[in-house]
Amino acid sequence: KRNKKLGIGSAIRDGMNYALKKNYSVFITLDADLSHEPKEIPSFIKKIKKFDFVAGSRYMNGGTSNYKGYRDFVSRLANISCKFLLRIPFKEFTTSFRAYSNKSLKVLKKATLWSDGYSSQIEFIFFIYMSGLKCIEIPIQFHDRTKGNSKIPRLQAFYGALKLLELFIRRLLTKKK
C-alpha cells in the first residue's frame, strides 16, 4: 500500500520490485480506468513467451485510439519525437499497457531510473531496448476516459521534454548491447 501519490513511474517501480521479490515470470501494466482493454492481456502473455518486453501501441497497424484534436496531436508528436531522437524502432513510447519478463525487470532494477511521472514510460523502453533484450510492439485499442479527469499534471510535458533530452544525450554516448 502506498501512503501518498508519488507518480505513475514510482507506482510501476514499486510493482516491479514486488514482482522481482516474488520471482514472477511476467509483470503486466495497464491503465485502471479501462482506457486499455483487459481482454487484450492474453495477447501480451502469448508474446512475452518469446520476447523480454511487449509494448502495446495504438499507433501501429491494427491499433486504434479515440483521442481527438489537441490531445491526439500532442501524443503523436511526443511519440514521433521519441522515435526520432532515441532511434528506437517503436511507434509508441507513452502507453502503460505492457508486459515485462523477469529478465527485463532485472535490467530496470539495475538502471538508474529517475522519472516518477509519465516520462518513466519512455525511460523504461530506453533502458530495456539499449540492454539488447528482445522487444516487440503489438497493436492495442485505446479508449480515452469517459469519466473523471486526466491525472497528468500540466508540468508533465515539460518534464517529459527534459527526460527525452537526457535520454537523447545518453543515446549519443551509449551503444546498444
What is each stretch, according to the model?
Residues 3-21, 38-118, 145-162:
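Acceptor/aglycone-binding surface of glycosyltransferases and processive sugar-polymer synthases
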Residues 15, 33, 101, 128, ...:
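Residue-level signature of catalytic and energy-coupling elements of molecular machines
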Residues 23-24, 50, 132-134:
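Short loop/turn motifs at secondary-structure junctions
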Residues 24-33:
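Short beta-strand-to-loop acidic/aromatic patch adjacent to the donor-nucleotide binding site
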Residues 30, 57, 141:
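Conserved residues at the C-terminal ends of beta-strands
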Residues 89, 113-116, 125-143:
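Catalytic donor-sugar/metal-binding loop of nucleotide-sugar-dependent glycosyltransferases
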Residues 122:
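DNA-recognition element of transcription regulators
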Residues 132-177:
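C-terminal catalytic/acceptor-binding lobe
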